[in-house]
């Protein structure tokens, strides 16, 4: 089958966009890394988050998945569902549902919510991007079938050229991926983050372990320096009483990237205008030195990027 890579340029100045992509502020990503984990450990269920911005995204976001930030630009993965997967009454060939149909996207937008690039990723039944992360050089994106225990393609995308490169394929649904530094191995989570993986750059599985935590399913993870990673996510719980709806519990977790043990975790009670927990899908955390900023896009289709900040952290 032919590999499908499509890059769509939206009406912007070629010169200005090239300049923006050619100078990603990698240093900004590493600034204050040494204190990021310690600052994160000060967060709790009682932490006050103040909403600073609401940026309306001026394009159809479909079903957003993961997000990272480089300089003043935001990169967000999303799945456009053309045909929703349908669950089988009984498993077939090891699968619990049909493949469905869709298109994988990696959107690039600015601080005004304007779409600058739409990079299409995937092939055949593998159209569902997951959580993404920037390693200081490349953006890592997994694109999987929209069902558990399936298959995935792992890409890295150069933020200067916005060209994707397939790195390897693997036999599971990879729901999120990040690299341990610019040259290290890759850490990944499966469907619902029930399994932790470690790959080398060629896709060899170095370790595969069960996730001992059942607090939330990790959706999006990013490096937090000092061999740490921060993951955000959600779990859906039954409502009390006669309600047939689900209660969305959001949360954040700090993990040791070497052992994948939880160092610190907390629930997040913030909700969007559509009633979703803000950590439902794309989340990016930024340490400013005196505060932690949380960027989130929890709603589908007509979305806004919500920006929260918490201060009064002990930064000594």
Where are the regions a protein language model picked out?
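Short coil/turn segments that connect the beta-strands within blades of beta-propeller domains
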Residues: 71-72, 136-137, 182-184, 226-228, ...
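Repeated scaffold domains used in trafficking and secretory/extracellular systems
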Residues: 62-66, 124-131, 171-181, 214-223, ...
């Amino acid at each position: 089958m032919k590999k499908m890579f499509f890059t769509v340029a939206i009406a912007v100045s070629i010169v200005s966009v090239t300049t923006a992509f050619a100078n990603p502020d990698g240093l900004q990503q590493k600034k204050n890394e040494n204190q990021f984990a310690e600052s994160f450990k000060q967060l709790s269920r009682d932490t006050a988050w103040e909403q600073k911005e609401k940026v309306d995204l001026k394009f159809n976001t479909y079903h957003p998945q993961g997000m990272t930030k480089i300089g003043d630009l935001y990169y967000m993965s999303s799945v456009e569902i053309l045909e929703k997967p349908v669950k089988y009454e009984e498993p077939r060939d090891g699968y619990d549902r049909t493949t469905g149909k869709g298109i994988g996207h990696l959107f690039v937008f600015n601080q005004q919510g304007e779409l600058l690039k739409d990079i299409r990723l995937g092939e055949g039944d593998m159209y569902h991007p997951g959580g993404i992360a920037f390693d200081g050089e490349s953006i890592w994106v997994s694109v999987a079938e929209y069902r558990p225990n399936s298959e995935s393609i792992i890409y890295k995308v150069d933020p200067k050229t916005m060209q994707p490169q397939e790195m390897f394929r693997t036999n599971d649904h990879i729901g999120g991926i990040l690299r341990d530094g610019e040259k290290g191995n890759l850490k990944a989570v499966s469907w619902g983050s029930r399994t932790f993986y470690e790959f080398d750059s060629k896709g060899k599985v170095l370790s595969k372990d069960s996730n001992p935590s059942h607090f939330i399913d990790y959706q999006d993870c990013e490096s937090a320096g000092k061999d740490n990673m921060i993951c955000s996510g959600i779990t859906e719980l039954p409502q009390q009483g006669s309600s047939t709806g689900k209660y969305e519990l959001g949360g954040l977790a700090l993990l040791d990237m070497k052992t994948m043990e939880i160092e610190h975790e907390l629930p997040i009670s913030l909700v969007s205008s559509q009633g979703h927990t803000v950590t439902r899908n794309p989340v990016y955390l930024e340490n400013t030195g005196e505060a932690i900023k949380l960027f989130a896009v929890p709603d589908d289709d007509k979305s806004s990027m919500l920006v929260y900040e918490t201060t009064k952290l002990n930064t000594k």
